[in-house]
């Protein structure tokens, strides 16, 4: 019996997302000097996927690719017992510390800001610990001041970019009556006013057409942020930190993005222990590493999801950006799959787990056949059918 055709071929249309439309997105670690960025990156690097798993990629010393933990993936591997298991991963870039005046080229300013432009989201590491042995660039620990310093530098660089864009558009408008130039000019003026009002681009009320234009700019304040509050091991264990309430209040007033308290000192201690010893230490102290949560939160923040292909040969996560349609998702496996796309046969993970087998999912009428307009959902288990000249089906 053929799979049941879906009555609803597409999910309700969402507003376009700010950012690059790609399955190869990455997140950068940002912060002032001596806040724990490099320590955090070194901890993550210990968990990174060996370079031989990416034979056609050069991984720079300031890049790490780490597995995204997922109980669904683990369950599928238990069910199918495949010859090959391929998890999703998050690419994390370590970015040099920023100083006040970076937008004007102070310190490593220009390099720093160009590196942020090259990533798709930000892990903003904040120092919330006092240590006389670790100097602070401003001679005192004040994470809210640090938040404002970095926020202002990014906004000032965006204002500079938008002003240059306005100047270029005005020159072009003298030579052409193209309506698109006028639309872009009007948008740039709105964006500049928004930034000069102390607001980041990602919190603007932009129309779909605006977002399409903004995505060509790769503005720094358009990128999603996850705040990582680095506290002492003692504060982390007792779940109390004097700086945290003020950080929460500031973030709530400025967009309300995710805050994750953690401790580089504690995570480094765990990373240096054998796994069984680390597990025992966590159990005895009723505490756990927050690195898996940080990885999963960062992955979701840059709008990445993944679908599964599953069978006895391989269980694999295929990462795509949210709002990706079935043919483009098929193209992440092979370009022929997109070119000759016929349909996607889709199971929901929860249905498979509840019913126990593909045959049971089919018998329950929950094995769906989706067309070209279907928007792939996180955790879909998909079997693509395609046909190209001289080709076949998967």
UniProtKB/Swiss-Prot annotation:
PROSITE patterns reported in the protein's UniProt record: G_OBG, TGS
Principal subcellular localisation of the protein: membrane
Membrane spanning residue stretches: none
Keyword Transmembrane annotated: no
Domain notes: The C-terminal domain is involved in RNA binding.
Required cofactor(s): Mg(2+)
Subcellular compartments: Cell membrane; Cytoplasm; Cytoplasm, Cytosol
Family: Belongs to the TRAFAC class OBG-HflX-like GTPase superfamily. OBG GTPase family. YchF/OLA1 subfamily.
EC number(s) reported in the record: 3.6.5.-
GO MF assignments: ATP binding; ATP hydrolysis activity; GTP binding; GTPase activity; metal ion binding; ribosomal large subunit binding
Binding site for GTP: 34-39, 129, 230, 263-265
GO biological process assignments: negative regulation of defense response to bacterium; negative regulation of response to salt stress; response to salt stress
Organism listed in the record: Oryza sativa subsp. japonica (Rice)
Quaternary context: Monomer (Potential). Interacts with GAP1.
GO cellular component, one term: plasma membrane
Annotated OBG-type G domain residues: 25-282
Matches recorded under InterPro entries: ATPase_YchF/OLA1, Beta-grasp_dom_sf, G_OBG, GTP-bd, P-loop_NTPase, TGS, TGS-like, TGS-like_dom_sf
Binding, ATP: 34-39, 56-60, 94-97, 230-231, 263-265
Ways its activity is controlled: Activated by GAP1.
Name assigned to this protein: Obg-like ATPase 1
Domain of life, per lineage: Eukaryota
UniProt keyword terms in alphabetical order: ATP-binding, Cell membrane, Cytoplasm, GTP-binding, Hydrolase, Magnesium, Membrane, Metal-binding, Nucleotide-binding
Chain's role: Hydrolyzes ATP, and can also hydrolyze GTP with lower efficiency. Has lower affinity for GTP (Potential). Exhibits GTPase activity. Exhibits similar binding affinities and hydrolytic activities toward both GTP and ATP. Binds to the 26 S ribosomal RNA in vitro, but not to the 5.8 S or 18 S rRNA. Confers sensitivity to salinity stress by suppressing the anti-oxidation enzymatic activities and increasing lipid peroxidation thus leading to the accumulation of reactive oxygen species (ROS).
Domain TGS, first and last residues per copy: 303-386
Pfam families: MMR_HSR1, YchF-GTPase_C
């Amino acid at each position: 019996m053929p799979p049941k055709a879906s009555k609803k071929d597409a999910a309700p249309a969402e507003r376009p997302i700010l950012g690059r439309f790609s399955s190869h997105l990455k997140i950068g670690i940002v912060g002032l000097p001596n806040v724990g960025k490099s320590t955090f990156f070194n901890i993550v690097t210990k968990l990174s996927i060996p370079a031989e798993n990416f034979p056609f990629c050069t991984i720079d010393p300031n890049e790490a690719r780490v597995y995204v933990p997922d109980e669904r993936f683990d369950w599928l591997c238990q069910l199918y017992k495949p010859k090959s298991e391929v998890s999703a991963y998050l690419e994390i870039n370590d970015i040099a510390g920023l100083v006040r005046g970076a937008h004007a080229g102070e310190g490593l300013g220009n390099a720093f800001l160009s590196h942020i432009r090259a990533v798709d989201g930000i892990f903003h590491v904040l120092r919330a610990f006092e240590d006389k042995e670790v100097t602070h660039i401003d001679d005192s620990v004040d994470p809210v001041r640090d938040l404002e310093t970095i926020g202002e530098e990014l906004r000032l660089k965006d204002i500079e970019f938008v002003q240059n864009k306005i100047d270029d558009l005005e020159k072009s408008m003298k030579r052409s009556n193209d309506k698109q130039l006028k639309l872009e000019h009007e948008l740039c003026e709105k964006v500049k006013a928004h930034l000069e009002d102390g607001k980041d681009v990602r919190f603007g009320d932009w129309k779909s057409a605006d977002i399409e234009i903004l995505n060509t700019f790769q503005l720094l304040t358009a990128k999603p942020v996850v705040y990582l509050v680095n506290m002492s091991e003692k504060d982390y264990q007792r779940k109390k930190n004097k700086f945290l309430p003020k950080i929460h209040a500031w973030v709530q007033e400025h967009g309300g993005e995710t805050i994750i308290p953690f401790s580089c000192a504690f995570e480094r201690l765990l990373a240096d222990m054998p796994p069984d010893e680390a597990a025992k230490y966590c159990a005895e102290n009723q505490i756990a590493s927050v690195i898996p949560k940080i990885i999963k939160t960062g992955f979701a923040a840059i709008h990445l999801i993944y679908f599964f292909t599953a069978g006895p040969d391989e269980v694999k996560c295929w990462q795509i950006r949210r709002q990706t349609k079935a043919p483009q998702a098929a193209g992440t496996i092979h370009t022929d799959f997109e070119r000759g796309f016929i349909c996607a046969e889709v199971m929901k993970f929860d249905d498979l787990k509840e019913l126990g087998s593909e045959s049971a999912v089919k018998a329950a009428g929950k094995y769906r056949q989706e067309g070209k307009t279907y928007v792939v959902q996180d955790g879909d288990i998909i079997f693509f059918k395609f046909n190209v000249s001289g080709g076949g089906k998967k």
